[in-house]
């Protein structure tokens, strides 16, 4: 499992099976590894966002850990989610925190009639194969002045020259890029070696 987490990008069917197999222990694993990205992301969003969001789309939503933190600050927001794993989605459904849940990869177009104030992608950018396509899709989901918040691992940030990629994109302007933050500090393979940056983009 850890090797798959480190590797990230792979065949979507393998990623789906990986998360289906992990689903029963998913939340406990992240607790054990001191995973704080959802809370950290919400804090950054709350600090920099200029609107009171009415609609959120939570891509690669997992079991709703980001939404649980987000809802503490924005309890009236209507939230939809998507994930590639059916078993993960089944867990989210039981929590009854999402209006709609879509079983699909975040790199495929979601068929929703809602225009969102915020789109989130927390802890899953590792699996993105086409970043320009993703930005284009997110742009299409958002209202004018909408926000896209996501995390990216620092090792992939450097490998992909991610700063340049963001600055060259024609869909968003950068609102905030965090300093490197611990990702899974109590995971023996990640520790403090692999960190994340949290990025907030505003729709142009």
Show where each model-derived region lies.
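A short SAM/SAH-binding and catalytic strip from SAM-dependent methyltransferases
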Residues: 118-131
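Class I SAM-dependent methyltransferase SAM/SAH-binding core
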Residues: 57-109
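N-terminal, positively charged/glycine-rich alpha-helical extensions of SAM-dependent methyltransferases
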Residues: 1-24
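A short glycine-rich, Lys/Arg-flanked "PGG" loop and its adjoining helix->strand segment in the class I
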Residues: 132-144
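Class I S-adenosyl-L-methionine
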Residues: 173-204
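A short acidic, Gly/Pro-enriched loop at the edge of an enzyme's catalytic core
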Residues: 109-119
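Conserved alpha-helix/loop element of class I SAM-dependent methyltransferases that forms part
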Residues: 35-52
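Conserved beta-strand signature within the Rossmann-like core of class I S-adenosyl-L-methionine
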Residues: 145-153
